[in-house]
């Protein structure tokens, strides 16, 4: 049906060009909001009526007659109706819709994929400080980043997944000091445990039980191995640097386990500390100074960021000689650009919104050829977790927050991914643990996965009865697929490639979750309306081809989300 649609669009473009030279680009179809209005809607007559000084409905009648005379419309279209002020409602023949079944079965796992576009994109996400286990907010970011990467892959991009490791900030000192105190036998609540002098009730060190675990392993002189490092503790509570390196390696290992539980893999871990040791931060600051985009005031070095759209100038280097946190960010993004990534997408929490203008200002001021608006940002809100009708704020591992691994252990990797992707990133989301484990239609991931498993059960029953395999269904006669539920299901299948393209362009994986729920609903309606394993062999094989194509698209869509498509449930 995708090829059918292209044929019809080409015919429409040709007729529009005849009516008004230069108007071929207006050739487009919309999906009617009401199924009774047809399969495609065209508004070209209303768009051209004013410049052509014609009545839109009369122009619609003229266009209708011209389209009906084309070979493509004669072959694939059952009827064209004029509605309202000039809408063209197009109703396809059953044979046109049946083509989508062949297209899906022929393309298989590649259905919905576009050709290689020869371009590279870097997506940076999670990028957590190595100071504790990944929390649920990191989980939302992980699900978003991975799904957006998968969407880009479907559109022909070469995708690079990157984790920026913040191993050079003040949080690392806090982690080290917290571990050192635990190693010395102290714990939160003791008089010596540091507090914020401006807010004595607030403990400024990390209090989770995982800090005691780090201290215990440090004293035991254990070796920890993470994705990018291995380190052995010496057990000396006075050796601050050794504690620091061990604690960072330990938590790198813990975060690796979190990511593995989420089935998430990165192409590169980029260390913030490397920006300092390589001289990139200093070189970036020097370039901004040389370009005349800085000034000194009150002992600090400032960037003239208001020259580039920021609401105020920003301090780059403080009085004590240390850099503010956006400076290494600017250096890091220059490095991304120099590595050949003309498109970069950063997935971050909405609390980072304030850094966008200053980072982009720094990149423009550096004058290295980076375009305005670089990089792209996808911002997400945090996640509220509810269990048993009550909000859960404390998990077993971190002590002060629910971790990603807590959520996976309470539910499943698939439920966490699907649920965290089921809303727009910038909308508040409440994760209902009880709903995520429910085996009913209210649970969206269960509903979609059950549709796939239900189809696989039918295909197994057919194969076990000596029917054959899915490959044998590619060229069957599909003329029996004429019922309303079958046609609705085929139309839903045909929407998948365009949905993927729109979701990739909008960096909106929630669109995939909406689509899959609609597809599952269409399948369940079809299954309830028509028996599949009937006695009539031709009808049976046609229906099997349709459900096999449906299973394929469910599988493909779930894969984009990083969710399994089970054969049994």
Curated annotation (Swiss-Prot):
Encoding gene per record: argS
Reaction it catalyzes: tRNA(Arg) + L-arginine + ATP = L-arginyl-tRNA(Arg) + AMP + diphosphate
E.C. code: 6.1.1.19
Keywords, in A-Z order: Aminoacyl-tRNA synthetase, ATP-binding, Cytoplasm, Ligase, Nucleotide-binding, Protein biosynthesis
Complexes and interactors: Monomer.
Location relative to the cell: Cytoplasm
Molecular functions per Gene Ontology: arginine-tRNA ligase activity; ATP binding
GO cellular component, one term: cytoplasm
Protein name: Arginine--tRNA ligase
């Amino acid at each position: 049906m995708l090829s059918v649609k292209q044929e019809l669009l080409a015919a429409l473009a040709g007729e529009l060009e005849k009516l008004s030279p230069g108007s071929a680009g207006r050739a487009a179809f919309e999906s009617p909001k009401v199924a009774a209005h047809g399969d495609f809607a065209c508004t070209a007559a209303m768009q051209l009526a004013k410049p052509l000084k014609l009545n839109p409905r009369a122009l619609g009648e003229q266009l209708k007659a011209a389209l009906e005379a084309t070979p493509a419309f004669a072959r694939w279209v059952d009827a064209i109706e004029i509605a309202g002020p000039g809408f063209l409602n197009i109703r396809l023949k059953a044979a046109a819709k049946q083509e989508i079944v062949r297209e899906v079965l022929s393309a298989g796992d590649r259905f919905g994929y576009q050709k290689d576009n020869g371009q590279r994109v870097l997506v940076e996400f999670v990028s957590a400080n190595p100071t504790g286990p990944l929390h649920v907010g990191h989980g939302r970011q992980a699900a978003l980043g991975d799904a957006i990467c998968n969407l880009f892959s479907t559109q022909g991009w070469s995708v690079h997944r990157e984790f920026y490791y913040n191993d050079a900030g003040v949080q690392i000192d806090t982690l080290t000091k917290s571990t050192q105190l635990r190693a010395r036998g102290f714990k939160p609540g003791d008089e010596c445990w540091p507090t914020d002098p401006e807010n004595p009730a607030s403990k400024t060190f990390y209090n989770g039980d995982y800090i005691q675990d780090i201290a215990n392993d440090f004293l035991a002189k254990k070796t920890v191995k993470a994705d990018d490092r291995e380190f052995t503790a010496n057990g000396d509570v006075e050796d601050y640097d050794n504690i620091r390196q061990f604690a960072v390696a330990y938590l790198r290992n813990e975060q690796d386990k979190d990511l593995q539980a989420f089935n998430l893999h990165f192409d590169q871990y980029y260390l913030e500390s490397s920006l300092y040791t390589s001289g990139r931060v200093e070189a970036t600051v020097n370039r901004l100074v040389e370009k005349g985009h800085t000034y000194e005031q009150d002992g600090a070095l400032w960037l003239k960021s208001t020259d580039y759209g920021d609401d105020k100038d920003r301090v780059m280097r403080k009085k004590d000689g240390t850099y503010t946190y956006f400076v290494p960010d600017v250096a890091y993004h220059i490095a991304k650009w120099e590595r050949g990534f003309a498109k970069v997408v950063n997935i971050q929490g909405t609390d980072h919104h304030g850094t966008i203008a200053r980072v982009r200002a720094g990149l423009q001021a550096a004058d290295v050829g980076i375009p305005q608006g670089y990089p792209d940002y996808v911002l997400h809100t945090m996640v509220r977790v509810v269990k048993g009708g009550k909000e859960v704020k404390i998990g077993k591992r971190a002590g002060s927050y629910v971790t990603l691994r807590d959520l996976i252990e309470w539910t499943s990797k698939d439920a966490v991914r699907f649920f965290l992707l089921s809303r727009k990133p910038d909308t508040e989301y409440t994760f209902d643990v009880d709903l995520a484990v429910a085996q009913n239609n209210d649970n969206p991931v269960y509903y979609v996965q059950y549709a796939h498993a239900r189809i696989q059960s039918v295909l197994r029953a057919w194969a076990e009865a000596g029917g054959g395999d899915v490959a044998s269904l590619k060229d069957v006669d599909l003329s029996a697929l004429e019922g309303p539920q079958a046609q609705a299901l085929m139309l839903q299948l045909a929407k998948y490639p365009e949905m993927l393209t729109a979701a990739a362009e909008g960096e909106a994986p929630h669109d995939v979750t909406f689509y899959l729920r609609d597809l599952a609903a269409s399948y369940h309606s079809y299954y309830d309306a028509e028996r599949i394993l009937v006695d009539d062999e031709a009808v049976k094989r046609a229906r099997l081809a349709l459900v096999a194509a449906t299973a394929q698209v469910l599988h493909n869509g779930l894969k984009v989300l990083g969710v399994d498509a089970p054969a049994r449930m």
